[in-house]
Amino acid sequence: MYSEIQRGRADIGGLMARPEYREWNPELIKPKKLLNPVKASRSHQELHRELLMNHRRGLGVDSKPELQRVLEHRRRNQLIKKKKEELEAKRLQCPFEQELLRRQQRLNQLEKPPEKEEDHAPEFIKVRENLRRIATLTSEEREL
């Protein structure tokens, strides 16, 4: 079986073009295959070995890249800091500011119900009010 493969390769070698630079000038510098700097580095080899071992053991590598995990971690930390600052700001408010906020909220609540009543008013009342406004505008224009 192995010998058949070797014979097949020998036949293919005869079909492939051989470089001509070897034959016509022996003084030329012959090219060498360049080393891949990534694969040549020790850290890359160790990383590759670790990934292979994890794959063999069935340990899944996190689906997210490291950069994305770091960014999510930073966002979470920023949100936590922001919430802490808001809570701290609420605690540090003096009683006077708290009372002002309560009064402002009460005023807002008192102003909202009249708007709701206008929304529920029948359409003919709204049209009548619009006609009154138009009538007053036209009378003012006539005076000018």
Swiss-Prot record:
It holds the Pfam family DUF1151. GO terms for molecular function: actin binding. One of its GO terms (cellular component) is ruffle membrane. Residues 105-124 are annotated as: Disordered. InterPro entries: FAM107. Keywords: Actin-binding, Cell cycle, Cell junction, Cell membrane, Cell projection, Coiled coil, Cytoplasm, Cytoskeleton, Growth regulation, Membrane, Nucleus, Stress response, Synapse. Residues 67-94 form a coiled coil. It is found in: Nucleus; Cytoplasm, Cytoskeleton, Stress fiber; Cell junction, Focal adhesion; Cell projection, Ruffle membrane. Belongs to the FAM107 family. This is Actin-associated protein FAM107A. It comes from Pan troglodytes. The gene is FAM107A.
